[in-house]
Regions:
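DNA major-groove recognition helix of helix-turn-helix/homeodomain DNA-binding modules
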Residues: 57-74
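Conserved core of the PLP fold type I
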Residues: 217-348, 365-379, 547, 559-560
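PLP-dependent enzyme catalytic core of the Aspartate aminotransferase-like
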Residues: 150, 243, 315-316, 497-499, ...
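Conserved glycine-rich beta-strand-loop-beta hairpin in the small C-terminal domain of fold type I
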Residues: 440, 456-467, 478-492
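N-terminal small-domain helix-loop-helix segment of the aminotransferase-like
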Residues: 154-256, 263, 442-446, 555-560
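A short, Lys/Arg-rich alpha-helix, primarily the initiator
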Residues: 1-25
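Conserved core segment of the aminotransferase class I/II
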Residues: 207, 378-457, 467-469, 551-552
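Short alpha-helical DNA-recognition segment
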Residues: 23-48, 63
């Protein structure tokens, strides 16, 4: 008979989760305590450990175990706390390296059943200790029966730089959904903003122009991109009221906006530098800042004010280490469109504190209800503005990876930073050249996205279905997005007392075969939101909402 789930052994992340909850700590509180104790770590890193996405970093382990009142070996392998080391006499003297290894000490304190754990930890310590080389010269001096070629078995771990990097949009939930699909389950996917799989076709004139120019696209281009595409981008913003004179040299083409975000953070941040990023955010911004050695500091967007940025919160979080402010407008994941008044106030803060403004405007042409998007570059002239945009969403060609960034505003003080951007652009040689030929055509002429977002257009109708159906479910509330193709409903935790929103979404996936991403995956501070992508057609979207309604009804019964 198969054992019940609660008898199965826990992995390290589950033991960590149990101990944290037993201490009554949130991931954010535990991260703060560890940082205060000298073992700097982020909430995202602890979440990664608990989910099993990353292993617990060895140099953080002693502090973690101390704060959770358990041994290191318990967290790593489940070994219970054991008596003093004097109860175990090793058959050979321990070198200083071995004797001082905290993890090894725990292993040596374990009973015979844990000899395998001790063997592994002794091996690790001995490999770092020159004093122990003689121990292995004679097989009779090898009490643990270790192979002489143990160096070939050294575990290859990911870089510690990735410990604070988290991107849940393609994380454990998607991985589970992929396994379920392989088993024959049909999953309704409301997790990724990729128009193509849902029947949104790219404009034919773009495909034709790219095909026609393929003979010209078989070699490298200029590192910043072909001239005609960059010129078309420049003229696009000039027509919108670009304040400062900008040259083609200020435009960089990239393999999607994602590449350019990472490139910017690498060029901008030294270790410990801070970037203000909206909460909730598109998680690549936080991941890129952390990967560059910086610190993502999240400012609040106010749900009661249709997710507009909280200007006072932004200002309160500016420090001497702050290098820039990120503005995602229209916003992913909330679908909010920021007012001109809010944008002007953010510009004023950037100018006052000499900060870089990074404006992610990839959804600037995906707008509803006749609203108008105001580019940040048309409002700022006394600070450096970097505008990010592309064709993935507005022209439904995400697979082309056709994106750009443009520098505007005050640039004299940023010459060294710009030199860094140029160097990094050259290191990746150039962006995908065939896709660069889509840009000039896309920037002018008929904008087919407008037909999709107008009343009775497909995206408009699907937005109405998603928001109205979500608001009809007891305990859910959702603001109406004015841009993009996402909404970010709130869960009333008085009705659904959720502690782990990823686990909640995992239960939804397994029970109802609907895939979405939890709110904390967008660096929201509480487990009470999730993101809905309303790209699927009306029939599939209604089916997903039926399943969601059924799932929440069952949860209400479960929670009583």
């Amino acid at each position: 008979m198969q054992p019940a789930d609660d008898t199965l052994p826990l992995h390290a992340g589950q033991r960590l989760l149990q101990r944290r909850k037993a201490k009554g700590l949130t991931t954010e509180q535990l991260a703060a305590l560890m940082t205060e104790a000298g073992a700097k770590v982020s909430r995202a890193a602890i979440s990664n450990w608990e989910r099993g996405s990353n292993g617990i970093v060895s140099n953080k382990l002693p502090v973690l175990a101390r704060l959770l009142d358990c041994s290191e070996s318990y967290l790593l392998s489940g070994t219970p706390n054991i008596p003093d080391a004097t109860t175990l006499q090793p058959s050979v003297p321990l070198s200083p390296t071995v004797a001082q290894s905290p993890s090894l000490g725990d292993a040596l304190l374990s009973d015979v059943s844990n000899a395998a754990n001790a063997r592994i930890l002794v091996t690790s310590a001995l490999l770092q200790d020159k004093d122990c080389q003689t121990v292995f010269s004679d097989s009779t001096s090898n009490p643990f029966n270790l192979s002489r070629d143990v160096t070939t078995m050294k575990t290859l771990n990911k870089s510690n730089k990735l410990q604070n990097v988290c991107y849940d949009i393609r994380g454990p939930l998607l991985q589970t959904a992929t396994r379920m699909e392989a088993q024959g389950h049909k999953i309704i996917k409301l997790n990724v903003g990729n128009p193509a799989p849902f029947g949104f076709e790219a404009p034919q004139e773009i495909l034709s122009d790219v095909a026609m120019n393929l003979p010209n696209a078989i070699g490298y281009s200029d590192s910043q991109g072909i001239f005609a595409a960059r010129k078309a981008i420049l003229q696009y913003y000039q027509a919108k009221g670009l304040l400062e004179a900008v040259d083609v040299a200020d435009v960089y083409l990239g393999n999607g906006v994602s590449e350019l975000i990472v490139l910017t953070m690498q060029a901008l941040l030294d270790d410990g530098d801070e970037v203000l990023i909206p909460m909730p955010d598109y998680p690549l911004w936080t991941a890129a800042a952390n990967l560059a050695g910086g610190k993502a500091v999240h400012y609040l967007c106010d749900e009661a004010d249709n997710w507009q940025p909280d200007i006072a919160d932004i200002e309160s979080k500016i420090t001497e280490r702050t290098k820039g402010i990120v503005v995602i407008n229209p916003n992913n994941p909330t679908g909010a469109l920021y007012t001109t008044e809010h944008l002007r106030k953010i510009v004023a803060l950037a100018e006052k504190h000499n900060l870089v403004l990074m404006a992610d405007e990839i959804y600037d042409r995906v707008l509803y209800d006749n609203v108008v998007h105001v580019p940040m570059c048309t409002l700022a002239k006394n600070c450096l503005v970097i505008t990010y945009n592309g064709l993935s969403k507005s022209h439904r060609i995400a697979g082309f990876r056709s994106g750009w960034m443009m520098l505007s505003g005050k640039k004299d003080h940023a010459s060294d930073f710009i030199e860094g951007l140029n160097m990094l652009s050259s290191m990746r040689l150039c962006a995908n050249v065939p896709a660069q030929y889509a840009i000039q055509t896309a920037m002018g002429g008929y904008q087919s996205m407008q037909a999709l977002t107008a009343p009775n257009g497909r995206l408009y109708v699907q937005r109405e279905i998603a928001v109205n159906r979500l608001n009809s479910i007891k305990g859910l509330s959702c603001t109406m997005p004015q841009g993009a193709f996402y909404c970010f409903p709130k869960i009333d935790r008085n009705i659904y007392p959720i502690e782990d929103d990823m686990q909640f979404m995992m239960e939804l996936l397994q029970a109802e075969k609907v895939l979405m991403v939890q709110g904390t995956g967008f660096n929201w501070h509480a487990p009470d939101h999730f993101r809905v992508v309303f790209l699927p057609n009306a029939s599939d979207l209604n089916e997903a909402m039926d399943r969601l309604e059924r799932f929440f009804a069952k949860k209400r019964q479960e929670y009583g």
